[in-house]
Amino acid sequence: MGSSGAGKTTLLNTLTFRNNGNIVSGQRAVNGIPINSTTLSSLSAYVQQDDLFIGTLTVREHLVFQALVRMDPQIPYSQRMIRVEEVIKELTLSKCQHTVIGTPGRIKGISGGEMKRLSFASEVLTNPPVMFCDEPTSGLDSFMAQNVVTVLKSMALKGKTIICTIHQPSSEVYAMFDKILLMAEGRVAFLGSPDDAFNFFKGLGASCPSNYNPADYYIQLLAIVPTQEEACRDHVDMVCDSFERSEQGIKLTAVTELSGDLQAKAMLSSWGETWQGGVANRSPYKASWWAQFEAVLWRSWLSIKKEPVLIKVRLLQTLVSMMETLFSFGQYKLTEEISSLSELCHRGRIFQ
């Protein structure tokens, strides 16, 4: 959590190897075991802030396509469909499973909350132990946002680690988080439970009022106000320095120092070797190129047959292209040579 420009998305992208253009120091590790981008991709899922779907597909058809191209090839088709059913029930998508996803301004489809849950469902299919979510409540009203976070909370209670950036959560949503990381100017202002955050800021003489949303209060407290930049930055430095000297900050520093020799821990771990030597060397693609081709062909056919006008337009386009090709090349023999540049341009004008 943090105000705009605090570094939330930058940190999330750094953790997931998505900002290779910037200089990053340090090491990424899971349970004390160092990982690379390929290993992390096989262990985690990333839910983008913007939802990208084929609007003519139904919710079920979209999930079936995802199961065909993203699940392990050793899993039979019947088991994949069972997993699709489980995910539909888990993400409460049963009522809209046969509804088209829709395209804003063009095709009426499912609601914003259902679309966001469908994004989670697409990633949960492979049952990843870690999930990264970039602004999962963006563009949703408070009720829909609470429903989305409730889904994330239920997944966390089943053993998954959910890491997300969030902007201006309601007090109900804020209370659902197990841990919060407050950021300001790229620094850690606080890391711990919501109750510990209240006690920490109370110790600084900035106790959150009883009738105030804690999330809004902390974000405003750490924001950089225009025309008051210098004073705000001094205040932010004071809060961040105070956290480093606090009990939680000292514990965090100790954990970091104990995890310094990550390579040694990996050698002592029986499953760390598997992560580094096995998973890291696997292909990033679950399905073969032929399986991907079949799945994409099936998806394209579903999309086209649901739009009769599109079929007519593409048929007309094909006929026009065929006639143009016939007109350009039909009068020449295969053995003829091109004698001039103008003739070459004339023959190839269809491709311009």
Predicted regions and their residues:
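Topological signature of polytopic alpha-helical transporters
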Residues: 1-4, 27-30, 47-48, 65-91, ...
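Conserved catalytic motifs of ABC-family nucleotide-binding domains
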Residues: 6, 36-38, 50-61, 74-75
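Short, conserved post-Walker A segment of ABC-type ATPase nucleotide-binding domains
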Residues: 9-21, 122
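Conserved ABC transporter NBD signature motif
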Residues: 17, 24-42, 102-103
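Hydrophobic anchor residue at the start of the ABC signature
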Residues: 120-121, 148
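A short, proline-enriched helix->beta-strand linker immediately N-terminal to the Walker B motif
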Residues: 124-129
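Catalytic Walker B motif of ABC-type/P-loop ATPase nucleotide-binding domains
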Residues: 131-135
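Helix N-cap at the start of a conserved alpha-helix in ABC-type nucleotide-binding domains
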Residues: 142-144
